[in-house]
Amino acid sequence: MQVPQLLVLFGSQTGTAQDEAERLGREARRRRLGCRVQALDSYSVANLIREPLVIFVCATTGQGDPPDNMKNFWRFIFRKSLPSSSLCQMDFAVLGLGDSSYAKFNFVAKKLHRRLLQLGGSALLPPCLGDDQHELGPDAAIDPWVGDLWEKIMVMYPVPLDIPEIPHGVPLPSKFIFQFLQEVPSIGAEELNIASSAPQTPPSELQPFLAPVITNQRVTGPQHFQDVRLIEFDITDSNISFAAGDVVFILPSNSEAHTQQFCQVLCLDPNQFFTLKPREPGVPDPPGLPQPCTVWNLVSQYLDIASVPRRSFFELLACLSQHALEREKLLELSSARGQEELWEYCSRPRRTILEVLCDFPHTAGAIPPDYLLDLIPRIRPRAFSIASSLLAHPRRLQILVAVVKYQTRLKEPRHGLCSSWLASLNPGQAGPVRVPLWVRPGSLVFPKTPDTPIIMVGAGTGVAPFRAAIQERVAHGQTGNFLFFGCRQRDQDFYWQTEWQKLEQKGWLTLVTAFSREQEQKVYVQHRLRELGPLVWELLDGQGAYFYLAGNAKYLPTDVSEALMSIFQEEGRLSTADASAYLARLQQTLRFQTETWA
């Protein structure tokens, strides 16, 4: 009797869906099922017709969009040419992760579940809809659903009786074995870095470009609550090209102080070199990690010790702990009944992995190095809208960065890893300051026809991609650029004020501003749109304008859509149903595009 084979495929934007997928993989191995865990876009989707048992774990991003690492799969699975019997041999389940404060809550999971049924798949259970807004987080829905799922799988796909389960509390074998080198290898610092300063091909996540920082300038006033930076990189000889609307991905590093503290708490020699040996055949090396590598480089450039740990972190840490009191507490925090306490201890105050390890020093000091890559996730790249055009700034790339800093009940303020790291970089210091980065196409696409007007609505740092678009269109001689820009105060966070005003004086730009804190009643961009309803309607309906929106995903898309609906009804004399259909047509024809973030 063969061991049943399970495939777990995930689409993850922030790491939560990947974490849940890895957790399912560990539970499968405990039950002695054969199991593979892969990102959807790294899996050869043509093989799906031969898979008997698949669990899909997928997040919903933005306004109902699939994560970046499942977009190719998403396009393929919705091909109209796929036969309705394509997946008739597959049993499947879909676990979704979303946020019920957004209109399209778990849209990706729901739509994928329906599509798999259309293609002949058999659903083991209704889809699980994890909700970030629940007081206990997604686990409130996931835990009971996963329990039912394993019951069903083990009945339908029984394991041979002579193969016992691995009990909880016993750690599974690590994915890799750390082989520490006795002699220091003769390699340079460049080879130890995850990125290159002289790429042969366009840079990518696996081979970023080390871009020198040219300028790092604060662009908010001294009294403004937030530090916002305009940062410029030199991309000479990088093979990087980009257009307005594209996105740059940046791979941050942990601070020297945190890296040193981590090595001390775990009793690691930061200067020790190592290579990795997979424990099982066919396991690929960790992506983007050079070998041989030093412990210092692993911790500073790869392990996300500044992230807030998930429940699975506590589960594995409890298995590894040899200290009775600490182990008992870790077991409690990782149990189903301990989720409220875990929320209060970790999620609510945004306590980091490093801080948790400091709270459990006996356990941390005895963690076998082999488990570091199982225990701690990889640092994830952060995406930024490119805020400049190569036509205006050749061989340069600019971004606008809001530095994340906030206070919780913990004594130390919370800092965003990437934004704080970028803000700390000083291009004036001795030697070049370099940042690993690469570029990908963004979600915004601008019209090439010279006489097509564009309406851009940008709130705060959401204006960044529109600066790139305006620079590009001006270089091509395209007029008809209408920018609705919203910020708090004219003298504190009016980004590129002088630049916009010069373009307006020359006839290249029509600028409409909304300063929300300069009067008693707050004024936002949606109010300015309503005030200029006749102009907006004439541009959209009379001149075929494209409409763009960028900013925070929580309220802005809904507020702006409601303003547009009002304009369509008042200026276009459309009924509510016709106005809704008009807005839908704009979206379908890419004449209404959004780039939003949570």
Curated annotation (Swiss-Prot):
It catalyses: 2 oxidized [2Fe-2S]-[protein] + NADPH = 2 reduced [2Fe-2S]-[protein] + NADP(+) + H(+). Residues 6-150 form the Flavodoxin-like domain. This is NADPH-dependent diflavin oxidoreductase 1. It comes from Mus musculus (Mouse). HAMAP family: NDOR1. NADP(+) binds at T461, S516, R517, K522, V523, Y524, V525, Q526, D559. PANTHER family: NADPH-DEPENDENT DIFLAVIN OXIDOREDUCTASE 1, NITRIC OXIDE SYNTHASE-RELATED. Belongs to the NADPH-dependent diflavin oxidoreductase NDOR1 family. It is found in: Cytoplasm, Perinuclear region. Keywords: Cytoplasm, FAD, Flavoprotein, FMN, NADP, Oxidoreductase. Its EC number is 1.18.1.-. One of its GO terms (cellular component) is intermediate filament cytoskeleton. GO terms for molecular function: electron transfer activity; FAD binding; FMN binding; NADPH binding; NADPH-hemoprotein reductase activity; NADPH-iron-sulfur [2Fe-2S] protein oxidoreductase activity; oxidoreductase activity, acting on NAD(P)H, heme protein as acceptor. Its main location: cytoplasm. GO terms for biological process: electron transport chain; iron-sulfur cluster assembly. Pfam families: FAD_binding_1, Flavodoxin_1, NAD_binding_1. Its cofactor is FAD; FMN. NADPH-dependent reductase which is a central component of the cytosolic iron-sulfur (Fe-S) protein assembly (CIA) machinery. Transfers electrons from NADPH via its FAD and FMN prosthetic groups to the [2Fe-2S] cluster of CIAPIN1, another key component of the CIA machinery. In turn, this reduced cluster provides electrons for assembly of cytosolic iron-sulfur cluster proteins. It can also reduce the [2Fe-2S] cluster of CISD1 and activate this protein implicated in Fe/S cluster repair. In vitro can fully activate methionine synthase/MTR in the presence of soluble cytochrome b5/CYB5A. FAD binds at R350, R382, A383, F384, S385, G416, L417, C418, S419, W597. The keyword Oxidoreductase applies. Interacts with CIAPIN1; as part of the cytosolic iron-sulfur (Fe-S) protein assembly (CIA) machinery. Interacts with DCPS.
